[in-house]
């Protein structure tokens, strides 16, 4: 069965449409650091407004542990959404209580309201299906139909993602549809050469995708904190750099499999090593197999790929027709250790085929480093969801919408 889309819901004029967005943006002291996920939701929300729907937006923000917490309120998000839509957006101070019911009741055709953070209710993320279903039914009372458009949460079995889609006539929004279209191009006969760039802190988070993609890619470039587990698997010492000892044997297996398949796993030849985790820490570029030979010795921290590696990665990326990147190459938040990530990002903007930035920290990195979204083929809104899709895992939030 194919994914159900909004067209399957019929005429939406005057109908209450609950839209599950992923508006989980970085927020500090009420200030939004990156509104990319809000902007990504605009296509679906604008289409529903133009169709005369009464739009009820729901989302989570952060991890408030199932209780109300002002620092995780969606109020600033609702205000920013209104600015981007160029329309008044109402805000309800609760999710399923009196404020939510009154705000939904007051909606006219084409109006929008944002309900308060779903995760102020522990039922949203409960492991108990019955508890989740009860919360979903409370949400369902506020709508006539349901549109799922939070791609970043479709890999989670949560009340607003899974059970709510069963409680009301449901369909996927345009954001989810576009995400799937791009990810399909990465898994179904991708144009070659096909390169995958993986970074980020933990190799354990990427093992599934490495295993699933090895038979499908031409080159796999490894950076970020995870590279040190690969270096250790090759017999090199890595100082005090991030290391997952329990994954070393698994990584050895992947290195052997890649060699058998003729897939290039490209590891850094040089790294930036510092004597502390701060922007003003003393640091230098050293060979990847000589990390403990720096003045910091066994206390040295590898915090970025080196310039030789960054240039080598960029050459491979620019020569590829399909590129998927997930995870920064270093601690890009600290200026001395941002160069590797910036070089890789710039190379992706020069790919003549399909370049995909895989959400999460990668999306935050390219924006923080000054790159406009439209310089890339696609910036995914789902870090974990896109990885699980590429692993070939079943995603409950898609299956409940008819996806197979």
UniProtKB/Swiss-Prot annotation:
One of its GO terms (biological process) is gluconeogenesis. The keyword Heme does not apply. Pathway: Carbohydrate degradation; glycolysis; pyruvate from D-glyceraldehyde 3-phosphate: step 2/5. Its EC number is 2.7.2.3. It holds the Pfam family PGK. CDD domains: Phosphoglycerate_kinase. SUPFAM superfamilies: Phosphoglycerate kinase (SSF53748). It is an enzyme of class 2 (transferase). It catalyses: (2R)-3-phosphoglycerate + ATP = (2R)-3-phospho-glyceroyl phosphate + ADP. Belongs to the phosphoglycerate kinase family. This is Phosphoglycerate kinase.
């Amino acid at each position: 069965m194919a994914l159900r889309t909004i067209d399957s819901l019929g005429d939406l004029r005057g109908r209450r449409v609950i839209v599950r967005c992923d508006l989980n943006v970085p927020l500090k002291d009420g200030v939004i650091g990156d509104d990319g996920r809000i902007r990504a939701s605009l296509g679906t929300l604008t289409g529903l407004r133009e169709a005369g729907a009464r739009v009820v937006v729901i989302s989570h923000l952060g991890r408030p542990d199932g209780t109300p917490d002002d620092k995780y309120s969606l109020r600033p998000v609702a205000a920013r959404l209104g600015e981007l839509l160029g329309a008044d957006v109402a805000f309800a101070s609760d999710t399923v209580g009196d404020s939510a019911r009154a705000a939904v009741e007051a909606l006219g055709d084409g109006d929008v309201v944002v309900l308060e953070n779903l995760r102020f209710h522990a039922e949203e993320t409960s492991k108990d299906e019955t508890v989740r279903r009860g919360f979903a039914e409370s949400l369902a009372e506020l709508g006539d139909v349901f549109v799922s458009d939070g791609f970043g949460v479709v890999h989670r079995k949560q009340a607003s993602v899974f059970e709510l889609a069963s409680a009301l006539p449901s369909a996927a929004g345009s954001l989810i549809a576009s995400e799937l279209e791009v990810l399909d191009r990465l898994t179904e006969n991708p144009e070659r050469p096909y390169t995958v760039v993986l970074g980020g802190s933990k190799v354990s988070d990427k093992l599934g995708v490495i295993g699933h993609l090895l038979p499908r890619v031409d080159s796999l470039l490894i950076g970020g904190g995870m590279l040190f587990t690969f270096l250790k698997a090759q017999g090199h010492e890595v100082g005090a750099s991030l290391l997952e000892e329990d994954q070393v044997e698994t990584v050895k297996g992947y290195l052997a499999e890649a060699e058998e398949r003729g897939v290039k796993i490209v590891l850094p030849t040089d790294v930036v090593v510092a004597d502390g985790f701060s922007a003003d820490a003393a640091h230098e570029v050293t060979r990847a197999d000589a990390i403990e030979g720096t003045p910091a010795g066994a206390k040295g921290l590898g915090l970025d790929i080196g310039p030789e590696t960054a240039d080598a990665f960029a050459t491979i990326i620019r020569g590829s027709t399909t590129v998927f990147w997930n995870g920064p190459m270093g601690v890009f938040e600290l200026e001395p250790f941002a160069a590797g990530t910036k070089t890789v990002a710039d190379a992706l903007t020069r790919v003549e085929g399909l370049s995909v930035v895989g959400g999460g920290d990668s999306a935050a990195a390219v924006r923080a480093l000054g790159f406009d979204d439209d310089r890339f083929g696609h910036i995914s809104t789902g870090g974990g969801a896109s990885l699980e899709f590429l692993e070939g895992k079943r995603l409950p939030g898609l299956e409940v919408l008819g996806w197979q």
